[in-house]
Amino acid sequence: MIDDTEDVAEFFRYWPKLAAWPDDADLVSWYRNTHTNLVKVLEDAPLDLECATFLLAASPLSMWTRRQASEIAIHRFDAEMSRGITSQFEPHFAGDMLDELLTAFVPRGRPVGPENPKTIHVHSEDTDEHWYVTVGPEQTRTELQGGKADLTLTATAADLYLLLWNRTPDSSVKMTGDTDLMDLWHGNFRVRWS
């Protein structure tokens, strides 16, 4: 697995050269061709594929399949929202994408928590799943079972997924407890490229 701080050069050695960006008139067909190619590559890949990864997963192939599904879903939401269209996600899919965010992305970041660790309980009502995200000064960890939480977020998997990717307002889910923890979340748990 690629370590963010030590293996960046090694990671980019595997990164494919990106094609030239298409003209606006060709963008939709370019995207469809790229999507078709991605699906074919993932379907044709052997189950024991060895390649660079950056998230914990059962296998490199499962990591990249899951990552690309989530990446496409969240940016589909962004594109549709720019046109005033509300995206819908099937509960099981949204639950899996939420699980990727909370168990793979969030724990790999730098410690951001307060001096006294705080726990956010994320409860997906439609999939009956629970995640307990504890933020502290030394690490952030996610467990599937827990006890007392400082803040509980309750909603559908899709609404939680969008909230925790910082796409929708806090009012989109039910919150019980220390809602100031959402300021910590919004300020620290997001993808940054610099």
Where are these regions (language model features)?
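Short, contiguous alpha-helical
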Residues: M1-A9, L55-P111, L160
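Short, helix-capping/interhelical loops that line the mouth of catalytic, cofactor-
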Residues: M1-E50, I85-M97, G109
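A generic "alpha-helical surface" signal
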Residues: A25, S29, M63-R66, L151
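Short amphipathic alpha-helical/adjacent loop interface patches that line ligand
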Residues: H35, I72, A157
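Conserved catalytic-core motifs characterized by acidic clusters
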Residues: L49-L55, R141
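A glycine-rich beta-turn/hairpin centered on an aromatic-Pro dipeptide
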Residues: L98-V133
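Acidic/His-leaning functional-site neighborhoods
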Residues: H123-T152, T156
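C-terminal interaction segments
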Residues: G146-S194
